[in-house]
Design a protein with these regions (language model features):
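Accessory beta-strand-rich segments of carbohydrate-active enzymes
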Residues: 3-16, 30, 46, 50-153, ...
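Active-site-adjacent substrate/metal-binding segments within catalytic domains
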Residues: 35-62, 66-75, 79-86, 92-95, ...
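Beta-strand-rich binding/interaction modules
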Residues: 166-196, 203, 625-644, 666-671, ...
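Substrate-binding clefts and catalytic carboxylate motifs of secreted carbohydrate-active enzymes
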Residues: 4-7, 11-15, 78, 126, ...
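Extended acidic/polar, glycine-enriched regions
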Residues: 110-112, 171-246, 663-664, 673, ...
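Short flexible loop/turn segments that cap and initiate beta-strands
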Residues: 179-181, 218-222, 624-626, 632-634, ...
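Short, hydrophobic beta-strand segments
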Residues: 105-107, 205-214, 657-662, 755-772
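Conserved structural position at the C-terminal beta-strand
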Residues: 121, 227-229, 671, 714, ...
Length: 796
């Protein structure tokens, strides 16, 4: 069937507010522009947004060629409880907000006249999530059309039979028997062709690709399968690669062991909200790749098609996850209400979305589902694993289990339950969402981590009852997902010699320990740090903040604050640390705890440091600075202005601390090997006296209708970043529109859809969409002065 984008010409209006219709282009997130309030029933979990119901409308006259054809609408993601209406007739309801679904509109279409398509997204049923969800049609919409003879949607499946010989299987489903032709293309070149006149509606073509270029994380080679059936032509991109998993070899791609250096990500795209713009999804993948990660976990819901396309192109592995809750509510209105009736359809749709993507290397059925401590939950774990194996026998299945939490849950501490979720929600509603309430579930667990630290959590996971409450579920999956269970690894490898262990959620500070264990032990498949890029919601989880950036009102907290990459896409010093700890960069690298601060931020279990990669603290001369040197070399030495301030044996954690007085001169770290020879050096430079606002686009040119990410940064006259410079910036755009604006501060008054922002450590980010003209102009004014800074970007 032919696919056509159906994203232009929509309007949206609130069903719970008083706003009129607005013209929008999909994808669109209605929540991101809503007001934030202490009255939010979702509270900090969703960034203090209110939530609401919205109606999207598209009026169109169907093309004459659609008449007599099969016509399907595809919604890649609508949050949530989506209703689809055509010309006043309700055609579909889909409760889950993260799965793509299809609606047959053929019989409802009226030809030769205007048709009215309505989609209702209901998100006023708060609370329904533990993180920011967005509202509305936040992923693209497509229309699929096909004649009498056609290849149905998802009718082509491709997998690798033998990577050594380049043999692939192309399974083709057609509407009726007939001739099917398959061409394999490498770029524009046809490298293999096969055709067959079939008497069946499902045909398997086994094809040898000559001199096959394999797909892996370092060489993401892609081919295209062009399948023809009558007048219908379908093209599917794929990679030639096989997966295998066992305790002898670990997880292998094309016969070579791969250790997952992973990061957990939520689905939002920062200032854009939940919108799954292809440019934003690709940027997210690229940023993780640049910072040493080779895998992502789509926490805790199925990811978008756009991010999978980016993973395929860039060589990033993906573990696609199904749901955050199964049978016990974590919030009053979460997906538990519908899961028992929809889980098979949801998993089927997730697999069909993922199957041809070489980047998808595993499925996860859930996250921190305490049901896995009980017999009925263990049984359900097995049912889902077996069902996924039936749908796709080529990939392993996992589930992220919070080991300590399973034990606590089993003795009634912090356990999720329908009754507690109901009680908490009703109490919050009566008191406007601002009451101090007794935490349950993950909120209870997160507060324990903040109060007691990560060691308490990791020690708790080693207790004997934790083993009793997890081993049943682990026996019903291929990869045992350990959330915060790294201190169990060595013991469990001996106790369960046939178990493959995956660190499905881990702390940043344990990167060095994971890597040291995994390198020598194939049963340790990999690690997914919480979290990769920062995200909206789950406020305060890892947000240590100094007083002058911290706001006292709870509702000003916007993000989790625990990303190794901040919400603007800038790497934090923690990401520099993990690059070295995971041996993806030799180092040394340097982080410096802000020199001008005398107060101490409250670090949580998900925080390692507030250090920044800068030595430009103008006005702080003589103040004591804490310098962090990231290196795995035996020894490191720190030089200030060419003078040694000390040589130290490197910490086993790959993070060695020095105390030095701040001076405005070069700060250099030198690493030495076991023989005392220099094996690496790194220098941070001070800043000059002049302060300049620079507009730095990530893209030299923009496509018409495409997105651009533009960093606003205070530097000196030579371009050296000045983290202590601060101002309120007002942004205007000509030849396009401003989609989002903000800084990396976890505390935000208002939202990301205004035209002004405070800077955070001297930086902010603007996200723009180019118009149809030949250039986009961005203008920035500082509150502290009348001077305007401008930049023009060509649009092609």
């Amino acid at each position: 069937m032919k696919k056509t984008a159906f994203n232009e010409g929509w309007t949206v209006r609130s069903l719970t507010g008083d706003s009129g219709e607005r013209q929008v282009t999909l994808p669109h997130d209605a929540m991101i522009s809503e007001p934030r309030s202490p009255e939010s029933r979702g509270e900090g979990n969703i960034g203090w947004y209110i939530g609401g119901d919205y109606e999207y409308t598209k009026r169109f006259t169907p093309p004459a060629e659609w008449e007599g054809q099969n016509v399907l609408l595809e919604f890649e993601g609508v949050y949530h409880n989506a209703e689809v209406w055509m010309n006043g007739e309700k055609l579909a309801f889909r409760p889950y907000g993260y799965t793509n679904f299809y609606v047959d509109i053929r019989e409802a279409l009226k030809f030769g006249e205007e048709n009215e398509l309505k989609v209702i997204a209901r998100n006023s049923d708060q609370p329904n999530s533990r993180w920011y969800t967005g509202t509305g049609i936040y992923r693209p919409v497509n229309v699929w059309t096909g004649g009498e003879k056609y290849i149905p949607v998802n009718g082509v499946r491709i997998d690798t039979e033998d990577y050594r010989e380049g043999i692939i299987n192309v399974k083709v489903r057609v509407s009726e028997p007939g001739e099917i032709r398959v061409e394999i293309l490498d770029g524009e070149e046809t490298v293999a062709v096969k055709s067959h006149i079939s008497s069946k509606e499902l045909v398997n073509f086994q094809i040898r690709v000559p001199d096959a270029k394999l797909w892996d994380t370092e060489h993401p080679n892609l081919y295209t399968a062009r399948v023809s059936f009558g007048d219908d032509v379908v093209e599917e991109t794929f990679g030639i690669r096989t997966l295998a998993w066992n305790t002898t070899d670990g997880l292998t791609i094309n016969g070579k062991r791969v250790i997952l250096r992973g990061a957990c990500i939520h689905h939002d795209n920062g200032f854009l909200g939940a919108c799954a713009f292809p440019e934003a999804e690709e940027r997210k993948v690229r940023l993780h790749k640049e910072n040493g990660y080779n895998a992502l976990r789509s926490a805790h819901n199925p990811c978008s098609k756009a991010i999978l396309d980016a993973c395929d192109r860039l060589g990033m592995l993906m573990m696609d996850e199904f749901a955050d809750a199964w049978t016990m509510h974590k919030t009053k209105y979460d997906y538990v209400t519908y899961l028992k009736d929809w889980w098979k359809q949801d998993l089927k749709d997730m697999v069909e979305k993922d199957y041809n993507h070489p980047s998808v290397i595993a499925y996860s059925t859930g996250n921190e589902v305490a049901e896995t401590a009980r017999p009925e939950g263990i049984a359900f774990t097995g049912r889902m694993t077996r069902y996924l194996h039936k749908l796709d026998p080529t990939r392993p299945v996992s589930c992220g289990i919070n080991i300590f939490f399973n034990f606590l849950s089993s003795i009634g501490l912090g356990v999720y339950s329908d009754e507690k979720a109901e009680k908490e929600s009703d109490a919050a509603a009566k008191k406007g969402g601002s009451q101090k309430k007794k935490p349950v579930g993950s909120e209870f667990y997160n507060q324990l981590a903040c109060l007691m630290g990560d060691k308490f959590m990791k020690f708790g996971a080693t207790l004997y009852p934790c083993d009793l409450k997890t081993r049943g579920a682990y026996a019903n999956m291929d990869l045992a997902g350990y959330n915060y269970g790294i201190w169990r690894y060595k013991k469990d490898m001996k106790k369960y010699p046939n178990r493959l262990i995956l660190g499905s959620e881990t702390f940043c500070k344990d990167a060095w320990l994971f890597w040291d264990i995994a390198k020598e032990n194939p049963p340790i498949v990999g690690d997914f740090v919480w979290a990769g890029m920062d995200y909206i919601g789950e406020t305060g989880m890892g947000a240590p903040e100094y007083g002058d950036y911290k706001m006292t009102e709870d509702e000003t907290q916007m993000t989790g604050g625990n990303g190794r990459i901040d919400i603007t896409g800038k790497r934090r010093a923690e990401a520099a640390y993990t690059l070295v700890a995971l041996e993806q960069e030799e180092g040394p690298l340097i982080g410096v705890q802000p020199v001008d601060r005398t107060d101490k931020p409250g670090l949580t279990g998900w925080s390692l440091t507030k250090a920044v990669e800068s030595w430009a603290f103008n006005g702080c001369e003589g103040m004591k600075a804490t310098v962090e040197v990231y290196s795995r070399a035996p020894k490191v030495e720190l030089f200030l202005g060419g003078r040694s301030v000390g040589r130290k044996k490197t910490s086993k954690t790959a993070r060695t601390l020095f105390k030095v007085p701040y001076e405005a001169c070069d700060l250099t770290a030198v690493a030495y090997d076991a023989s005392g020879n220099e094996c690496g050096r790194y220098t941070l430079k001070p800043a000059g006296g002049e302060t300049v606002l620079r507009i730095i686009p990530e893209e030299e040119t923009l496509k018409a209708g495409g997105l651009g990410f533009i960093r606003l940064r205070f530097t000196d006259e030579n371009g050296v970043w000045k983290p202590l410079a601060r101002d309120i910036l007002k942004v205007s755009v000509a030849g396009g529109e401003l989609l989002g604006l903000g800084s990396a501060n976890s505390y935000v008054r208002g939202n990301y859809t205004t035209d002004s922002t405070d800077t955070y450590y001297g930086e902010a980010l603007a996200i723009v969409r180019a118009g149809a003209g030949d250039e986009l102009k961005i203008s920035v004014t500082q509150r502290s002065g009348s001077e305007m800074t401008e930049l023009r970007i060509p649009v092609i």
